[in-house]
Design a protein with these regions (language model features):
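Glycine-rich, acidic and aromatic/proline-enriched surface loops and short helix-turn segments
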Residues: 83-91, 124-127, 153-156
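Active-site-adjacent helix/loop patches that line small-molecule binding or acyl-intermediate pockets
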Residues: 1-108, 116-119
Length: 240
């Protein structure tokens, strides 16, 4: 579960998950999102953030009820994790109930977006939290700076380490078949292909980046590269 010891004066055994790209960390995140509102209002606010990230109020953000029912109906492991976290005092003071937290988590797992929308979302992260199409600031640059390392280290399930080695840019995949990745200050890219590999990533979505990368100079680890490729000159608002 990757609980990290975080003792307090009143709970010296407190442990909390710090990685939002694993189930326990995602559930912890849900417990802290708009806790002052009821669950429906919390979901509406989260979906509005998705719209802002994906191009504004006209972005086709939706919600898939069958996915929600599937997530909710096969969640024994998540309930187990939730009770373990609750038992260790992991949840913050703003925590409402485990039922609210997990149901919101299942609902957020059921949000729908288009591939174009995911590319705009990735471009917003590449642009430091400023949507390149609408000009609206969604996240602060500091928040984006904190998000991208987590995406690089954990965004691709058990393939994350190999992805970081082969491709070297922050990315996030989902079991719906989407992979979106962020080249900071350059562009955001989204690939959707629903066939999954053995670890839950899109089979085709994990293939193109290495072969589509004509020059590695944008990668943080290629400090020996001095030339700048045409890839670096891509307009962040450009669509393929």
């Amino acid at each position: 579960m990757c609980l990290k010891p975080s003792p307090t004066d009143d709970n010296p055994n407190r442990e909390i998950p710090h990685n939002p790209c694993i189930n326990a960390g995602a559930m912890m995140t849900m417990s802290m999102v708009y806790p002052e509102y009821n669950r429906n209002a919390r979901l509406a606010k989260i979906m509005q953030v998705w719209k802002d990230l994906s191009g504004g109020d006209d972005a086709p953000i939706g919600y898939d009820d069958p996915t929600y029912k599937s997530e909710s109906g096969s969640a024994d492991r998540n309930w187990c994790l939730g009770y373990m976290m609750k038992g260790s005092g992991a949840f913050p003071p703003c925590f409402t109930t485990l039922d609210d937290t997990l149901e919101l988590y299942f609902q957020v797992c059921s949000i729908l977006n288009t591939n174009d929308g995911m590319a705009i979302m990735a471009s917003t992260l590449a642009n430091g939290g400023l949507n390149p199409l609408t000009g609206k600031r969604i996240f602060s640059a500091d928040h984006v700076r904190n998000v991208l390392p987590i995406m690089l280290s954990s965004g691709m399930y058990d393939y994350s380490g190999q992805w970081a080695y082969d491709v070297g840019v922050p990315a996030k995949s989902g079991v719906g078949g989407c992979v979106f990745f962020v080249v900071p200050n350059v562009c955001g890219i989204s690939i959707w292909s629903p066939r999954l590999d053995e670890v839950g990533n899109s089979t085709r979505g994990t293939e193109p980046p290495p072969s589509a990368n004509p020059h590695p100079s944008y990668r943080a680890y290629h400090t020996h590269c001095t030339s700048i490729s045409a890839y670096l000159l891509l307009d962040i608002t450009q669509r393929c």
